[in-house]
Amino acid sequence: MTPTLLSAFWTYTLITAMTPGPNNILALSSATSHGFRQSTRVLAGMSLGFLIVMLLCAGISFSLAVIDPAAVHLLSWAGAAYIVWLAWKIATSPTKEDGLQAKPISFWASFALQFVNVKIILYGVTALSTFVLPQTQALSWVVGVSVLLAMIGTFGNVCWALAGHLFQRLFRQYGRQLNIVLALLLVYCAVRIFY
């Protein structure tokens, strides 16, 4: 990979990993509501799911030309529905002011999000088909870059969770407003899947 292509790869992956999306918003919300330690299950579920999705993207990238567009469209609708469900859960979750502390979303729920998270699927397919496959079709490179993509994505999730933890007091003071803003951002993510 040339230095220019490598620079473009790092720019694309880091910007994509750090911008708002379902995972980052969920990580922020979970750490704000429950603290970083209690959110590790959420982060672990996201990380494992992310890795598996990136490995699946490696396989998909090899056969993009034969993928049925209807299947991709159905995946988009499933992803949008799940993201809207997450938005509803965040918007209606109790805040500290409500006197209740709901449990953080489970490992398996955050794991399942990855399989309908269109942002990370497009992230993986785009990175692999743009930066890796034109250079090499060696399976070791494709799998290695898939693992790297999952690590970069996990880094973004942890950064957002740390922000939620560090600003927990402020975010808890304005918990209801924050939950609504985060829910609206998730709805925006769901709408952006189609437009």
Swiss-Prot record:
Residue ranges that the UniProt entry lists as topological domain Periplasmic: 1-7, 68-69, 126-141, 195
Question: Where is this chain's protein located in or outside the cell?
Answer: Cell inner membrane
NCBIfam families tied to this protein: PRK10323.1 (NF007653)
Q: How does it sit in the membrane?
A: Multi-pass membrane protein
UniProt main location, coarse: membrane
Keyword Lipoprotein assigned to the entry: answer is: no
* The protein's role, per its UniProt record: Exporter of O-acetylserine (OAS) and cysteine.
InterPro entries xrefs = LeuE-type
Tell me which domain of life the UniProt entry assigns to the organism this sequence originates from. Bacteria
Q: What family is reported?
A: Belongs to the Rht family.
Known PANTHER family for this protein? ARGININE EXPORTER PROTEIN ARGO (PTHR30086), ARGININE EXPORTER PROTEIN ARGO-RELATED (PTHR30086:SF20)
Q: Which reaction(s) are listed as its catalytic activity?
A: O-acetyl-L-serine(in) = O-acetyl-L-serine(out); L-cysteine(in) = L-cysteine(out)
Q: Name one GO cellular component term.
A: plasma membrane
Q: What is the name attached to this protein's record?
A: Cysteine/O-acetylserine efflux protein
Topological region Cytoplasmic: 29-46, 91-104, 163-176
Question: One Pfam family name from the record?
Answer: LysE
Entry annotated with the keyword Transport = yes
- Recall the GO molecular function terms of this protein's record: amino acid transmembrane transporter activity; efflux transmembrane transporter activity
Where do transmembrane segments lie in this chain? 8-28, 47-67, 70-90, 105-125, 142-162, 177-194
What keywords appear on the UniProt entry? Amino-acid transport, Cell inner membrane, Cell membrane, Membrane, Transmembrane, Transmembrane helix, Transport
The UniProt entry's GO biological process terms, in alphabetical order, are: cysteine export across plasma membrane
